[in-house]
Regions:
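Interface amphipathic segments
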Residues: 1-219
């Protein structure tokens, strides 16, 4: 069989009737999906897709205020073959950093080996600021550089996740957080957490470890 789907500047407002009354969605999506298959030869089809969204905006009401999320860029790509599957994505929120990544699954019907990378660049809590009242603040920078390996049954992750210069003073948290640092390091099937959360009453020192020999240990 063969299937081809092409989107030419699809206006996402057509989905508005299916959303809750407090939700709003706008923007345009374009892209293409192609697939062909022969189940007598292989149960895994051949497929390719690429979708781009421009000016994607979503908002909902939270505690009486409107929380908007606007993406300057959103791109999703993928390829599926009997021998491998590849996913890719780029997400760029308005007014802050972005997220890029890719993931490959080799031998998806057998060993399902993984390899990939996710990079988060200079993300700030800009999305929280519409929820803040006058005098409240939320600052900090979130970054990550992670690589994946192993298999779906025994995943492995390497790299670092950091939160730097975190300051939070808002009604939805029980204390005021002064400049604080948190770091998470992944080393295959284990990770370490370090950091210091500073408050007016004192500091909270973070020090922890975790491991996951198999995927079942994630649950």
């Amino acid at each position: 069989g063969v299937l081809k789907v092409r989107l030419e500047e699809l206006n996402l407002e057509v989905l508005q009737p299916y959303l809750k009354r407090r939700e709003r969605l706008s923007g345009h999506v374009k892209g293409e999906f192609k697939a062909d298959w022969d189940i007598d030869k292989n149960v895994i089809p051949n497929a390719d897709w690429a979708f781009d969204a421009d000016g994607l905006a979503y908002s909902t009401r939270v505690d009486g205020g409107r929380l908007p999320v606007t993406l300057e860029a959103l791109r999703l790509t993928g390829t599926v073959r009997p021998e491998h599957a590849v996913l890719g994505w780029t997400v760029k929120p308005e007014g802050t950093g972005g997220v890029e990544g890719n993931l490959t699954i080799e031998d998806p019907a057998g060993e399902r080996r993984m390899k990939g990378r996710v990079v988060v660049s200079d993300m700030t809590p800009v999305l929280l600021k519409p929820l803040l009242s006058k005098g409240e603040r939320a600052e900090g920078v979130f970054a990550a550089d992670l690589t994946a390996g192993g298999t779906l049954e025994a995943p492995r992750i390497w790299g670092d996740v950091t939160l730097k210069g975190v300051e939070l003073d808002a009604g939805f948290v029980p204390f005021e957080m002064n400049p604080s640092e948190i770091a998470l390091r992944f080393e295959g099937d284990r990770s370490t957490l370090t950091g210091r959360i500073s408050t007016a009453e004192g500091d909270l020192v973070l020090d922890g470890r975790a491991s996951w020999p198999t995927a079942e240990d994630w649950t």
